[in-house]
Every structure is written in C-alpha cells, then in structure tokens.
C-alpha cells in the first residue's frame, strides 16, 4: 500500500492490490477522520495501525464517499467510529452491499471477517461540516458515478477527496452520465490545490484543468458514439469497435483496467439510452 502526506495532518493511501483504489485520513490532536476504506481487510487494517501508532489518535468518524465495496466494506475495522454517508448509501448497502458481501465471502476467505456497518449519520442535500483540529471538512453530494456519491473538501488546504466522481477514467455503469459531467464541471471550478481521486494518483493544481477537460471530453465522446450506435441494429458490435484511445484516454490507466471499464461504460450507456423512460 502506498502512503503519502498531502498536507499537514492530511494523508492519502492507495491500494497496491485492487484498481489503485484510494482512502484518506485527516487527523486532529484528539481524533482522526477516515475517508473511505480500501478493498481488502489487510490494507484497511494497515491504515488503522498507522493512525493508532504513528498519529496516536483514535478514529472518531469514517466517511463513505459511496456504497461500493472498495470504499465502504472496511467500516467494520473502525469499531466505535461514527460512519457518515449520503442517505442513499445506507439504502444501497442494505439492498446490494449485504447480499454482495455474502456472495463474496463464499469465494474469498479473506472477506469472512468483514461485516457491513451501515452509516449512522446521513444527509441528501446541502452540506455537512466537521471540524478536525484546525481544519474544516465540508461534505457535499457529488453524484454521477453512483446515486449516493459525496465528496469531502479540506477547506483550508483546498484538497478535495472526490470519491469516484473523479477518476482517471470516469465510470458510469452504476451512475448517470449527465450527473457525473455536472459533478466534474463543479470540481473544476472549486479552486483546488489537489484532487484525491477515488482511484489513481493525486491530481496537482497545475494538472486539474487538463484532467477536468480530458474527463469531460471522454464522456462527451462516448455519449456521441453510443447515440450513433443506438440507431443501428448491430449496436453492440459497433460499440466493441470503439477503442479507448479514440476517446482520448489510455488503456494503461488504473493498472490496465481502463479498456475493460471503457467497454462496460459503452454497454451501460447504450442500455440507459434505449431502455423505456
């Protein structure tokens, strides 16, 4: 697992095992906030060990940017912490998270110690503010990757933990393309120093404009291509011919997963465009 100090008392963690998924920690003198948990227990436990033994504070809050397994299944490794999330996150963990975990535990012994912990504090509109030491964390909706997405701004440092609303390759299979485009545009206007993506590396201030433009161009490109394909009888075959490079992205993103995710985006978007409203 990679670890980096982003600013004073703000830390970033990236999985070496699963899809470069990330998590964060903001620490104060008395307690810390964890922003997302990683996909596998060992890595999440390493984050807890770092907080308890290097920072010497307990974890009081865990913020889930959305309900997906690689961001929320590690809540159970922070006993006593209050979990904060979008109201829809709680519903989705009940509807999808619990059955998905039960199925995964049959296949992967490492997950047998995992238990879904539902959010204790939820919201669906506006903002929630947490004071951690000298820093304000502003939590607000960031939809599009999923219907329960939120982002966390470290106000004083202008660092945004964007969750999966911002990734090297936008992923909309469980989301909405128009909502994620809106979220990305809003992120681009925030005057940020850093974007901590839900997967991949930290985006620095001088890289933000280009990253925003690249993601919006990608989404516009697939929207145009899928709309054209949807008018043809062999739509699926046409989608299979659309390479990720044609959209301005690289297949090496996310440890080589990008091409697979791109194809899933195309098929999901076709389904969304053609299903009855």
Tell me what each language-model feature is.
Residues 9, 26, 36, 51, ...:
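Divalent metal-coordination and catalytic microenvironments
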Residues 85, 181-238:
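Divalent-metal (often Zn2+) His-rich catalytic cores of metallo-beta-lactamase-fold enzymes
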Residues 228-277:
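C-terminal regulatory/interaction regions
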Residues 20, 40-42, 67-73, 90-93, ...:
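Active-site environment of divalent metal-dependent phosphoester hydrolases
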Residues 122-154:
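Core dinuclear metal-dependent hydrolase active-site scaffold
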Residues 2-49, 151-164:
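Conserved beta-strand hairpin/beta-sheet module of binuclear metal-dependent hydrolase folds
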Residues 44-45, 49-129:
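Active-site HxH/HxHxD metal-binding segment of metal-dependent hydrolases
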Residues 35-37, 60-68, 84-87, 141-143, ...:
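Active-site neighborhood of phospho(di)ester-bond hydrolases with catalytic His/Asp-centered motifs
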């Amino acid at each position: 697992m990679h670890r980096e100090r982003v600013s004073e008392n703000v830390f970033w963690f990236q999985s070496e095992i699963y899809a470069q998924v990330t998590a964060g920690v903001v620490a104060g003198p008395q307690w810390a906030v964890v922003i997302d948990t990683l996909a596998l227990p060992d890595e999440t436990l390493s984050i807890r060990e770092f907080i308890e033994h290097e920072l010497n504070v307990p974890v009081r809050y865990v913020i889930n940017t959305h309900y997906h397994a690689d961001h929320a299944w590690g809540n159970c490794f922070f006993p006593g912490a209050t979990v904060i999330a979008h109201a829809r996150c709680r519903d989705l963990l009940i509807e999808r998270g619990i059955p998905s975990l039960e199925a995964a535990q049959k296949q992967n012994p490492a997950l047998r110690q995992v238990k879904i912990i539902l959010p204790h504090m939820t919201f669906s509109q506006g903002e929630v503010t947490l004071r951690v030491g000298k820093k304000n964390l502003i939590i607000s909706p960031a939809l599009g990757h999923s219907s329960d997405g939120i982002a966390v701004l470290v106000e004083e440092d202008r660092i945004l933990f964007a969750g999966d609303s911002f990734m090297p390759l936008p992923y909309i299979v469980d989301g909405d393309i128009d909502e994620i485009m809106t979220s990305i545009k809003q992120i681009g206007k925030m005057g940020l120093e850093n974007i901590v993506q839900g997967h991949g590396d930290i985006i620095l201030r001088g890289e933000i404009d280009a990253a925003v433009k690249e993601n919006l161009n990608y989404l516009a490109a697939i929207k145009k291509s899928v709309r054209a394909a949807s008018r043809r009888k062999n739509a699926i075959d046409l989608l299979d011919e659309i390479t990720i490079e044609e959209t301005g992205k690289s297949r090496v993103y996310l440890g080589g997963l990008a091409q697979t995710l791109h194809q899933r985006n195309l098929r999901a978007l076709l389904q969304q465009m053609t299903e009855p409203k």
